[in-house]
Amino acid sequence: MSEISLIMLAAGNSTRFNTKVKKQFLRLGNDPLWLYATKNLSSFYPFKKIVVTSSNIAYMKKFTKNYEFIEGGDTRAESLKKALELIDSEFVMVSDVARVLVSKNLFDRLIENLDKADCITPALKVADTTLFDNEALQREKIKLIQTPQISKTKLLKKALDQNLEFTDDSTAIAAMGGKIWFVEGEENARKLTFKEDLKKLDLPKPSFEIFTGNGFDVHEFGENRPLLLAGVQIHPTMGLKAHSDGDVLAHSLTDAILGAAVLGDIGELYPDTDMKFKNANSMELLKQAYDKVREVGFELINIDICVMAQSPKLKDFKQAMQSNIAHTLDLDEFRINVKATTTEKLGFIGRKEGMAVLSSVNLKYFDWTRL
């Protein structure tokens, strides 16, 4: 049995997919797409090593200890070159995680022809009339190249050392004078590029699990600046002591959302030792945090917030706070509830030394079936 390693390319920005969630984090059942695709291929062969390129290594590592991860580059070629540094097997298989449904039959065709050339690649024939600059091309000579592809590792490394931009391994190998062998590709191995492509693939739907997070924050009164809650000015001078603008509600809610998605906490994301967050707009930081949560495949279901303050009274501001949260997070207002309570003059809150906020949120996986 030939010694083969597997590289899965999952560091793309999903620009053409045009959704808040990166396509590699779409959930198929409970698995993000990148993991589903990698599990699928890894079930076909005892690979020597499996390497996944990533733009979010810390988060991906939460899912498995079975693979190695490496930060991707700005282009496909850069990402592949970095991943190849970890590979020493004779052959390497490279695939895009966006090709989710590669079959065992296609995989076997690649393996069976391993000794035929320097790179074995699947390709589809073109059935439709094809024009270039309004002139018909000979479609019999046109191939639609797919992945996974298997290459001789040393030759692929040498090809990429030219620092040219190759869009796949076969063109890189061919540029070195290497021999390419084509096997029959398949429709199911088409790349998921645009959100409309989801309708063409029979993928498992995201599970209906719900993820709950809580956030709690406390701040002391004492700054002669506006008191802000959810970006709404409550009082012109009763400001809270903080590195940022002191919006304790926004801080609590940020922590709740990050916690539900298992993405750490506000202190990790926006440390108070970093001067770029000095007097920062906390609602803008909340939005940025939620963008990160959506990027990895989640969306909000609802928000419930309890503000604990002896003073000032908040009854007249609750509606404005709910509206501002809804606008910031692009969430229906009927999914947001803000409550206010005192501590019956007990403790530091009762002594009007500060205030606290407890936030609870529920998240679900982004439902890509609605696209």
Curated annotation (Swiss-Prot):
Q: Which source organism? A: Campylobacter jejuni subsp. doylei (strain ATCC BAA-1458 / RM4099 / 269.97)
The pathway this protein participates in, as annotated, is: Isoprenoid biosynthesis; isopentenyl diphosphate biosynthesis via DXP pathway; isopentenyl diphosphate from 1-deoxy-D-xylulose 5-phosphate: step 2/6; Isoprenoid biosynthesis; isopentenyl diphosphate biosynthesis via DXP pathway; isopentenyl diphosphate from 1-deoxy-D-xylulose 5-phosphate: step 4/6
The record's PROSITE patterns line, in alphabetical order, gives: ISPD (PS01295), ISPF (PS01350)
Which keywords belong to this entry?
Isoprene biosynthesis, Lyase, Metal-binding, Multifunctional enzyme, Nucleotidyltransferase, Transferase
The protein's matches in Pfam families, at most eight in alphabetical order, are given as: IspD, YgbB
Described by its record, this protein's role is as follows:
Bifunctional enzyme that catalyzes the formation of 4-diphosphocytidyl-2-C-methyl-D-erythritol from CTP and 2-C-methyl-D-erythritol 4-phosphate (MEP) (IspD), and catalyzes the conversion of 4-diphosphocytidyl-2-C-methyl-D-erythritol 2-phosphate (CDP-ME2P) to 2-C-methyl-D-erythritol 2,4-cyclodiphosphate (ME-CPP) with a corresponding release of cytidine 5-monophosphate (CMP) (IspF).
Question: Site annotation (Positions MEP for the nucleophilic attack): which residues?
Answer: 139, 191
Q: Which residues are marked as site: Transition state stabilizer?
A: 16, 23, 243, 342
Q: Where is this region: 2-C-methyl-D-erythritol 2,4-cyclodiphosphate synthase?
A: 211-371
Q: Which GO terms describe its biological process?
A: isopentenyl diphosphate biosynthetic process, methylerythritol 4-phosphate pathway; terpenoid biosynthetic process
Molecular function per GO = 2-C-methyl-D-erythritol 2,4-cyclodiphosphate synthase activity; 2-C-methyl-D-erythritol 4-phosphate cytidylyltransferase activity; metal ion binding
- Claim: Metal-binding is one of the keywords in the record: yes
Q: Which cofactor does it need?
A: a divalent metal cation
**Enzyme Commission no:** 2.7.7.60, 4.6.1.12
Q: Would you tell me the protein name for this molecule?
A: Bifunctional enzyme IspD/IspF
- Region annotated 2-C-methyl-D-erythritol 4-phosphate cytidylyltransferase, chain positions: 1-210
Binding positions (a divalent metal cation): 217, 219, 251
* Assigned protein family: In the N-terminal section; belongs to the IspD/TarI cytidylyltransferase family. IspD subfamily. In the C-terminal section; belongs to the IspF family.
